[in-house]
């Protein structure tokens, strides 16, 4: 398991992402929209820069649900590759089995 501080940091980032999601998406739409005047677009860029850095979804790291491992994460299962293999060998994942040919 990762350190407690790492887990809490990820939880905090997730809360901030959810809190600022709507505001951030509206500002991004304004920045991309060419119909809006350049001054308004520039103001939207400045407002976007004032939002907390951790409110950006790209700052969130996918982690294994059982071990907290950040690498070799499989989105489909929410687990790392080792835990997917263990679960598959135990038959805990329906429809998944070791290939053989």
UniProtKB/Swiss-Prot annotation:
InterPro entries: Ribosomal_uS14 (IPR001209), Ribosomal_uS14_bac/plastid (IPR023036), Ribosomal_uS14_CS (IPR018271). It comes from the Bacteria. One of its GO terms (cellular component) is cytoplasm. GO terms for biological process: translation. It holds the Pfam family Ribosomal_S14. Keywords: Ribonucleoprotein, Ribosomal protein, RNA-binding, rRNA-binding. The keyword Ribonucleoprotein applies. GO terms for molecular function: rRNA binding; structural constituent of ribosome. Binds 16S rRNA, required for the assembly of 30S particles and may also be responsible for determining the conformation of the 16S rRNA at the A site. Part of the 30S ribosomal subunit. Contacts proteins S3 and S10. PANTHER family: 30S RIBOSOMAL PROTEIN S14, SMALL RIBOSOMAL SUBUNIT PROTEIN US14M. This is Small ribosomal subunit protein uS14. It comes from Blochmanniella floridana. The lineage of its organism: Bacteria, Pseudomonadati, Pseudomonadota, Gammaproteobacteria, Enterobacterales.
């Amino acid at each position: 398991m990762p350190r407690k501080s790492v887990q809490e940091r990820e939880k905090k980032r997730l809360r901030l992402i959810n809190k600022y999601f709507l505001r951030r998406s509206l500002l991004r739409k304004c920045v991309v929209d060419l119909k809006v005047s350049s001054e308004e677009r520039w103001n939207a860029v400045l407002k976007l820069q004032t939002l907390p850095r951790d409110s950006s979804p790209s700052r969130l790291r996918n982690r294994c649900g059982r071990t907290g491992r950040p690498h070799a994460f499989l989105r489909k299962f929410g687990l790392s590759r080792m835990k997917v293999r263990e679960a598959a060998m135990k038959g805990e994942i329906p429809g998944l089995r070791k290939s053989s040919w």
